[in-house]
């Protein structure tokens, strides 16, 4: 039997979810977390037991919640995200209470009949990269000559 034949397709999606280093989160149409893989635990610090059944507010900073839910609800009504708005770097919350930056990709999930089921997100911790880019921008600003101010 070949290796390909020995892979049980029905278990493959579970193996992929468990093995991927990125966070994979699925929330239903009410914004309740229904799937939280081990990568999500690594990125956000919450276990699946702490997350499943909770609102996405668990990982959304309070000041960003209105914008998040406005976008979430519009995507449900529209039947998907707008082109070009499927990926972004945004702030999120870690279990420690510390803000983190995540590089997040979104998709609305539909069943084969086209019925909207909820949304999924794949996220990577981008905090170190964001801080490094911020430091590089600051250094560049310090090295860039400023226009001379006219004497008064």
Task: Identify the function of each model-found stretch.
Residues 43, 50-52, 59:
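Alpha-helical sensory/transduction surfaces in regulatory modules that relay environmental signals to outputs
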Residues 39, 48, 60-102, 110-112, ...:
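PAS/LOV-family and closely related PAS-like sensory domains
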Residues 6-35, 39-41, 84, 145:
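Sensory modules in modular signal-transduction proteins
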């Amino acid at each position: 039997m070949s290796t390909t034949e020995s892979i049980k397709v029905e278990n493959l999606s579970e193996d992929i979810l468990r093995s991927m280093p990125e966070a994979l989160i699925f929330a239903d149409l009410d914004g309740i977390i229904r799937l939280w893989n081990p990568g999500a635990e690594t990125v956000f610090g919450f276990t699946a037991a702490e997350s499943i059944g909770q609102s996405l507010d668990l990982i959304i900073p309070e000041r960003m919640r209105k914008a998040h839910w406005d976008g979430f609800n519009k995507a449900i009504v529209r039947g998907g995200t707008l082109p070009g708005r499927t990926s972004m770097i945004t702030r999120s919350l870690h279990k420690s209470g510390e803000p983190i930056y995540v590089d997040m990709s979104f998709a609305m999930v539909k069943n084969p009949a086209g019925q909207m089921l909820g949304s999924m997100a794949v996220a990577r911790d981008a905090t170190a990269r964001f801080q490094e880019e911020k430091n590089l921008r600051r250094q560049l600003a310090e090295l860039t000559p400023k226009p001379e101010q006219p004497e008064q």
